Amino acid sequence: MSIKRSKLSVKALFAALLALVLVLGIAACGSSNDNGTSTSAGGGGGQIVSNPDNGKVTLTIGSKNFTEQIVLGEIYSQALQAAGYTVDKKLDLGSETVALAALKNGQISGYPEYTSTALTSFFSVQPEQVPSSPQQAYQESKADFEKQGLTAFPPTPFASANAVGTLKTTADKLGLKNVSDLTGQSQKLTLYGSPECRQRVDCLLGLQNGYGLQFKKFVPVDIGLRYTVLDKGQADLSILFTTDAQLAAPQDKYVILADDKHVFPAGNVIFVTDQSTAKKAGPDYEKTITQVQSGLTTKAMQELDARVDVDHQQPADVAKQYLKAAGYIG
C-alpha cells in the first residue's frame, strides 16, 4: 500500500524524531558511544556559560563542503559564540585537502575531520590498519597532527564511512549485497563519487586494489548530487556516506553494499585546530566542543542531516534547533 506524506507531516516527523534521538543520545552520554566503546567525550546536558574573557579571542571555524560538515561547523560556531568567543565562519571550503591547507595557512582556526580520513589521506595509513577503536584512532590522529603543530579534540559518538550505494531496484536486478558481488559485473557499471575519491585509498583506489574492481567509467560529481545521479539513471553506483539522511528516510529506496573486505574504515569526527590557537583560547575551547558534540549519536546526526537534505532547512537553523533541544543554549 502506498502512502503519500505531506510536506507538513514530514516536518512534524523529523521534529519528533530529532527530539527523541537527542533525549536518548544525551541521556547516554559518558557511558558508551555508537561503537560500543566507553567514551569520556564530556558535556552532556547543561547550558553553556559565557565567559567574558573569551571575547578577546577570535575563532574562525571552517568545514568541508557537504551537509554533515556544514551542520557540524554551525554547531561548533554557535556553541563557541555562546561561550563568549568572537566567532567567524568559513564553512563549505572544499575537500579535506583544502580544509587542512586553510588551517595550516591561518585562514581558519579549526574544522571537523574524520579520524579515518585523517589517517588514510594525510598520514599514509592503509584502510585495514585504521584502528577499530575510536579512542585509539583518535590518539593516533592526534599524535600525527601534533607533529605538524596542530592538535585534535576528542571524538564524536557517531562515526561515518564511505560506502558503495545503489538503488534497491539495481541491487535486486544484479544480485548485489556485498561489494565483492560486483566482481565480473563492475566493468559494465558506471560509478560516481566526489572528485577526491579517485586518489583516496578508502574510495576508488580501495575498490580497485582491495577488491580488484574496474568500472566502465568513474565520474567525479559534486557531493550534493550523489543521490541525484542514481535517481536519474546516470550512475549505476555512487559513493555515499553511512550517515547520509537519505539512508534514514522511511522509503527503502537506496541500499548500501556491505564492505566485506573492509576497505572503507569508519571514522569518528575530531575537531582539528592549531596548538597556538588552542593555548590562546584556553580550556573553554575544547570543553565547549566536546560538550556540544556529546549528544551526536548516529541517529541524531542522520536526523540533523535530514533536516537540511530532505526538509530543506538551513544548516544554521538546524544547528540552533539541536543546541536548544539539548539545553546547551537558551
Regions found by a protein language model. Name each.
Residues 150, 156-160, 247-292:
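Periplasmic-binding protein-like
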Residues 74-82, 97-108, 124, 205-210, ...:
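Short helices/loops that flank or line small-molecule/ion binding pockets
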Residues 89-101, 195, 216-228:
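Short helix-initiation/N-cap motifs at beta->coil->alpha
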Residues 24-28:
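C-terminal motif of bacterial Sec signal peptides marking the signal peptidase cleavage site
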Residues 30-33:
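Bacterial signal peptide processing site
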Residues 115-126, 140-141, 229-256:
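A ligand-binding cleft/hinge motif common to bilobed small-molecule-binding domains
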Residues 131-190, 275, 294-298:
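A conserved helix-loop-strand patch within extracytoplasmic ligand-binding domains
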Residues 40-74, 91-95, 196-199:
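Extracytoplasmic "Venus flytrap"
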